[in-house]
Amino acid sequence: MVVEGEITVAAPREAVFRSLSDAPFFASCIDGVRDLKQIDATRYDAMLETRIAYMRFTFRVTVEMSAVSPPETIEAKVEGTPVGMVGRLTASATTRLSETGHGTNIHYAINATLTGKLGSMGQPVLKAKAREMEKQFSERIAAAFAPGGARATA
C-alpha cells in the first residue's frame, strides 16, 4: 500500500529538515506513538497504538533513518509486530523537501505492507486508516510551523 502526499509550511527548508530529523518532534506528529527510545544514532524503538476498523492494535516498532541528505531528503525504514498476535508491519518512507516562494514543500511517500491478521483486513480498510493518519500528521506539522506554533520561525 502506497500513501503519498505533500504539504507546504511557512518555514525555511533547513528549519523544517531539522524538525523532521528530530525524532521526538516527528513522533509527536503521529497519533498513537509512545515510549520512543533512541537505540543508536539512526535507530529508535517505540510503541504505536491505533484503531483499525473496529479493532485496537498496539505495535512494537523499530525505525531506522536509512539515508539522510540535509536539507533535502530523509529516508526511513519501519519494522514492527502487533502485540499479542501474529503479523508484521514493514514500511519504507521517503521525505523530500523543496523550497517554495512561501516556505518549504514537504513531499512524502510511504510504502507499507501488513501481513497476518492485519493484512487480511483488506486494502480499502487499511488505506482509509492510512489516509486518516496522514491527515492528522499533516495537520500537526502545519500547526507546528504556523505563527505561534512550536516550530514557527520569525
Question: What is the role of each PLM region?
Answer:
Residues M1-R51, P147, A152-A154:
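Hydrophobic ligand-binding cavity/cleft-lining segments
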Residues P12, A41, P70, T100-G103:
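Short strand-connecting beta-turns/loops that link adjacent beta-strands
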